[in-house]
Amino acid sequence: MTTPSAELPALARIRDDVRAMQAYVVADATGYLKMDAMENPFGLPPALQAALGQRLGQLALNRYPGTRQNDLKAALAAYAGAPAGSAVLLGNGSDELISLVALACARAQATVLAPVPGFVMYAMSAQLQGLGFVGVPLTADFELDEAAMLAAIAQHRPAITFLAYPNNPTATLWDEAVVQRIIDAAGAQGGIVVMDEAYQPFASRSWIERMRAQPERNGHVLLMRTLSKFGLAGVRLGYMIGPAALVAEVDKVRPPYNVSVLNTEAALFALEHADVFAAQADELRAARTELLAALRAMPGIERVWDSQANMVLVRVPDAARAYEGMKARKVLVKNVSTMHPLLAGCLRLTVGSSADNAQMLTALQASL
């Protein structure tokens, strides 16, 4: 006889905080226009798709990943313009890298700090690894509250400070001088700063330029990127660049063979054709300009924030109603209005192709 899961004695062995959590569920989006996950709408051109398939088909899948990953690390370092003396760490998506940094720093009473609202994985990884989390609210315009950030760093002395550059879900790219002062303050008390550049293909600048120009001020900075927004969300490949000594310590808690031979080869193939993905990013930036203008001209939209990513944050009179109305019209967006008080009334819209954006705008207008 099977014991109902709610009565399983073994459940008592699961941590209380884990049992209180909700598992991440990907809803079935069949038949919907997906504008909720900041995915690149463009696939590979057919010729490249065929070439990639042929290349992957030649891999020895019966063998564990080997030194081919060193080729990928070198290619990523060259592509990103990694500073001298840096190293690259690969992850199964940037989510794994966030968890690895948290795990490497998981001492008693250690703290993670980040601006909020921000990427939810910073707080979740801290919780799962037993670190405290301190969220410092942004201003009403979703800019960094420099005084509050500096005060929080002085008070909590965080082991890790996460700065998303640009931020998710606000799509803001914060002032360089303010960011540098926060990095300086975190470093002055011995902390690590992780610059999360998941949306770098759509931003006007990268922190890696500062890391090259001022290595002495950024020697405690780890810069993290992903190929998801590059156009390979299905591949799950993140990478982290930073001082070799620091990267080597985080690498010690990485599971062996965490990145598959398929992911490695697909990433190398993508970098060999970086011009294709750069052209797609150019097209999306142009589409973003058009989308921002259309949203600002739309009656009923209360506010539209500037964007340095492939998403746009808007405030509407009733976010839940607008979300459900768009869903009924087969368009999925992200209702972020309950994620943080500063996001009240807000929806996060993915920047898609011109045709996708037009369909999304029509659904939004009809749902306000």
From Swiss-Prot:
Its cofactor is pyridoxal 5'-phosphate. It is an enzyme of class 2 (transferase). Its EC number is 2.6.1.9. GO terms for biological process: L-histidine biosynthetic process. Pfam families: Aminotran_1_2. InterPro entries: Aminotransferase_I/II_large, HisP_aminotrans, PyrdxlP-dep_Trfase, PyrdxlP-dep_Trfase_major, PyrdxlP-dep_Trfase_small. One of its GO terms (molecular function) is pyridoxal phosphate binding. Keywords: Amino-acid biosynthesis, Aminotransferase, Histidine biosynthesis, Pyridoxal phosphate, Transferase. The modification N6-(pyridoxal phosphate)lysine is found at K229. It catalyses: L-histidinol phosphate + 2-oxoglutarate = 3-(imidazol-4-yl)-2-oxopropyl phosphate + L-glutamate. Disulfide bonds: none annotated. Pathway: Amino-acid biosynthesis; L-histidine biosynthesis; L-histidine from 5-phospho-alpha-D-ribose 1-diphosphate: step 7/9. HAMAP family: HisC_aminotrans_2 (MF_01023). Belongs to the class-II pyridoxal-phosphate-dependent aminotransferase family. Histidinol-phosphate aminotransferase subfamily. Homodimer. PANTHER family: HISTIDINOL-PHOSPHATE AMINOTRANSFERASE, HISTIDINOL-PHOSPHATE AMINOTRANSFERASE-RELATED. This is Histidinol-phosphate aminotransferase. It comes from Acidovorax sp. (strain JS42). The lineage of its organism: Bacteria, Pseudomonadati, Pseudomonadota, Betaproteobacteria, Burkholderiales. The gene is hisC.
